[in-house]
Regions:
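ATP-dependent small-molecule kinase phosphotransfer cores
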Residues: 1-33
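Residue-level recognition of specific faces of alpha-helices
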Residues: 5-8, 37, 52-55, 66, ...
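Short, flexible helix/strand-to-coil boundary loops that buttress conserved ligand/catalytic motifs
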Residues: 10, 67, 112
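Small-molecule kinase domains that catalyze NTP-dependent phosphoryl transfer to phosphate-bearing small molecules
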Residues: 15-21, 29, 47-49, 70-120
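Switch II (G3) loop of P-loop NTPases
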Residues: 33-43
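Conserved phosphate-donor/acceptor-positioning beta-strand/loop module used by diverse small-molecule
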Residues: 35, 47-70
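Short glycine-rich, flexible loops that bind phosphorylated cofactors or substrates
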Residues: 43-44, 62, 108
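A short, charged, Gly/Pro-tolerant segment at domain boundaries
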Residues: 121-128
Length: 128
């Protein structure tokens, strides 16, 4: 059935993506920090492999609208099914170390720059 096929696909893809990321990240020693982006960080247990978690949040209706604009071949039902397989945003927000609001009421870039400054300061103060 479909859920079983999706699970098999995830079992094949996620470990390889993680290996690829680790290979890439290990070559970034000169960077003040490294960011890993993935829609399923918590679901895949990848949150346990990073020092801090940033969650970008937006209302569900806006997320759906953005996916439909980006992926014109998807239906709203397909997008909702994808979102339903993810953790609820509220749970991700509770577990987050940092939040970025991407709800069109706040500018995103200033929020990102603020986090960049924090991460660079931590790097300098830790001396590593």
């Amino acid at each position: 059935s479909r859920p079983e096929r999706l699970e098999k696909l995830n079992q094949l893809v996620h470990p390889r993506v993680a290996e690829d990321y680790q290979r890439w990240a290990s070559g970034q020693q000169l960077a003040p920090y490294v960011i890993r982006e993935a829609a399923l960080m918590y679901e895949a247990g990848a949150d346990k492999t990073v020092d801090r978690m940033i969650v970008v949040r937006a209302p569900e209706a806006l997320r759906i609208q953005r996916v439909l604009q980006r992926d014109r071949n998807r239906t709203e039902d397909e997008v909702r099914n994808i979102l339903n397989r993810q953790w609820p945003e509220e749970e991700k927000v509770k577990r987050a170390d940092f939040l970025i609001d991407n709800d069109e009421t706040q500018l995103v870039i200033p929020q990102v720059l603020l986090l960049h400054e924090k991460f660079c300061q931590r790097k300098q103060s830790s001396g590593s």
